[in-house]
């Protein structure tokens, strides 16, 4: 059963197009729910009504086309290493190559009030833009035809609440702000939408 499910996830990574999209964010239905609590002073059961977020009935909110692979600049090797430690298969380009990819342009960024591993949490809104780029040797390539594809999308799609952008590991800023190397308005992750042969070498997860 587990092996069959993993094989299905890998096969979907090779199947691009309609019906095989990436769900980035979801919305849940809010409902009233009655809960029985213990009244602290008397110790008697008390029924209260609460707002209940029904995550089991969550509906897709932001959906994007399923990419063939994600690409990440070699300067973010520490982020790539985090992915490989989680079991994600990664490769690196052996030589520079020009590719047509989808890039994320940050339209809005709101900084949170909490820290995660010394990073401020972010909530971002992006738009996807098609462009041709030269990717240098050492660029990380994360194919979606692997068992960890679902986790990979959660980690790399910027709007995902659990993404590296949301957690502050990939610094970004809103488009139109003063450009900064530390916080660019273009997310340093790119979506390769067509199957291509790339000259790559495997990345050692150690």
Model regions and ranges:
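Hard-cation-handling environments
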Residues: 1-101
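Short, charged low-complexity intrinsically disordered segments located at boundaries
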Residues: 7-28, 110-116, 171-174, 188-192, ...
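A short linear-motif detector with a strong N-terminal bias
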Residues: 48-51, 118-122, 177-178
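Substrate-recognition/cap regions that form aromatic- and gly/pro-loop-enriched pockets
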Residues: 58, 63, 80-139, 143
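Short, hydrophobic/proline-enriched secondary-structure or compact coil segments at domain edges
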Residues: 70-74, 138-146
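Accessory, solvent-exposed terminal regions and/or long lumenal/extracellular loops of proteins
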Residues: 147-152, 156-206
């Amino acid at each position: 059963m587990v092996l069959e499910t993993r094989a299905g996830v890998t096969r979907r990574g090779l199947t691009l197009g309609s019906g095989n999209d990436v769900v980035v964010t979801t919305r849940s239905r809010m409902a009233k729910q009655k809960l029985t609590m213990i009244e602290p002073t008397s110790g008697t059961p008390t029924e209260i009504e609460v707002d209940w977020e029904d995550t089991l009935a969550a509906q897709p909110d932001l959906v994007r086309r399923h990419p063939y692979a994600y690409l990440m600049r070699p300067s973010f090797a520490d982020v790539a290493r985090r992915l490989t430690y989680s079991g994600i298969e990664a490769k690196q380009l052996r030589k520079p190559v020009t590719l047509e990819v989808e890039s994320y342009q940050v339209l809005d960024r709101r900084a949170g009030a909490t820290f995660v591993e010394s990073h401020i949490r972010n909530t971002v809104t992006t738009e996807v833009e098609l462009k041709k780029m030269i990717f240098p040797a050492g660029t990380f390539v994360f194919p979606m035809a692997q068992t960890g594809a679902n986790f990979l999308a959660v980690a790399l799609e910027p709007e995902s609440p659990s993404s590296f952008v949301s957690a502050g590991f990939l610094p970004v800023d809103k488009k139109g702000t003063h450009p900064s190397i530390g916080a660019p308005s273009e997310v340093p992750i790119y979506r390769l939408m067509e199957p291509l042969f790339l000259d790559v070498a495997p990345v050692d997860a150690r």
